[in-house]
């Protein structure tokens, strides 16, 4: 089980990413705009750097919804491989069954 504090930290990061997404995108467009002046682009870089670190999407980590496990995460189910296997064996996931060939 992942610590509750780690789960809370990830939830906080998700909120920050959503809050600053538009602002970040606008600044990145301005930074990559070759028609903008160097001064405007540099100001945009400084503004981007002044945003909270956790508002960057790359700081988020996918975690299992049940256990908080960060590794072996399967996006399709939102669970770790271990919990997917357990649910599969119990028949809780429709259409999913153990492979046999």
Curated annotation (Swiss-Prot):
GO terms for molecular function: rRNA binding; structural constituent of ribosome. InterPro entries: Ribosomal_uS14, Ribosomal_uS14_bac/plastid, Ribosomal_uS14_CS. Keywords: Ribonucleoprotein, Ribosomal protein, RNA-binding, rRNA-binding. GO terms for biological process: translation. It comes from the Bacteria. GO terms for cellular component: cytoplasm; small ribosomal subunit. Pfam families: Ribosomal_S14. Belongs to the universal ribosomal protein uS14 family. Binds 16S rRNA, required for the assembly of 30S particles and may also be responsible for determining the conformation of the 16S rRNA at the A site. Part of the 30S ribosomal subunit. Contacts proteins S3 and S10. This is Small ribosomal subunit protein uS14. It comes from Aliivibrio fischeri (strain ATCC 700601 / ES114).
